[in-house]
């Protein structure tokens, strides 16, 4: 069951689309680290700003629509699958970042003077309908969360007129749904291509024999197909990639897959699945003395636990990200402040990439609430907040990630590449401050996103034409 859980967990890789967050998207994305010291936190954590943006929190006289679970507090739900017994704590970093944000925001007076209250919501992977019922009954909005089987939120999501500013989305149903705005958009048919363009320019010879090793679950198969479609749209990347599927529930041995990789003379490898599973593949390759010249993976592999557990086996594995790097907080003030806020307001919370995505979602939600209150007679109302969020055309989460356009709903053309070395991650591209750094720590490609053809899942369930996308 634990192997099954990890296979399901990878379904949320994207977030930055990820990021595909996004961007890429990832259940295990980001570098797990420790929070800053209380001494560091005390200096800037409550400065009235976050990174390069003014804090959206503070005093006011707003009220919450009483017909939308309104009351003396603004009730928000950050759904996770933390209670899945085979993998306890799945995506708990989303909720941990939410708790830190709420503590930080309430210290400043809440949002427009209304204190935030967290409605803890656990879908435990397989209990999404029950979790959705709870949120409909108790929460004003869903903020900063994400569920592996997010397509199961519907139709109840629309029936109760819920709104969502998610940390990440997984399925095409959710990614293309109405009633939500993503801080780092992850549409199913538009994907970042910057990492492929980098490989084309810098490692062309290593693209001669590409292979994608993907889990056979529907979600991971769709990600592999999306990557293959992106590869074909970019063009000039060598031969057509072959996709080999492994059992998402786990294999007794990955030696046969390693042998196939060697026998085929694979020069380029992308793995679609959970980092722990890939460690087994890498070690199987080590045992037969074979290594593809270039290994590039999505954002869920930018994970310090992956690098440290894999050790030398992970050396050279490249992962893309659209978020500030944990390893360089001195270069990214928003990252340093995020660590400070975690240290002060949730010191025992897990710090990882999904937490950054959740925090950005909360910042966007609070910003949208402020805009709504200005035009809605001081009343915080769902559709008003949703429309205010949709109107935001430039967003970086205060500098937590590359610039996105939530209104347009497309991924960023910018990003960075991290490479595993000696049990940790180091920046590969762009070097901060170099000519390649053309966007405050990231590189933006002229053709950094692409429309990709293909059917990656049923989008109709997430649609409610009365609400708009």
Identify the meaning behind each predicted range.
Residues 216, 228, 275-280, 326-389:
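Extracellular/periplasmic ligand-binding modules, especially the Venus flytrap/periplasmic-binding
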Residues 19-31:
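Bacterial lipoprotein signal-peptidase II cleavage site
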Residues 46, 58-73, 77-99, 121-124, ...:
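Extracytoplasmic "Venus flytrap"
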Residues 139-245, 293-318:
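Extracytoplasmic ligand/sensor domains, especially the bilobed periplasmic-binding protein
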Residues 38-67, 393-469:
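Solvent-exposed, acidic/polar segments of extracytosolic/periplasmic ligand-binding ectodomains
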Residues 1-17:
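Sec-dependent bacterial lipoprotein signal peptides
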Residues 4, 89-96, 107-178, 246-254, ...:
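Beta-alpha junction/loop-to-helix N-cap segments that form part of ligand/metal-binding clefts
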Residues 285-360, 431, 458, 462-466:
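Extracellular/periplasmic periplasmic-binding protein-like sensory domains
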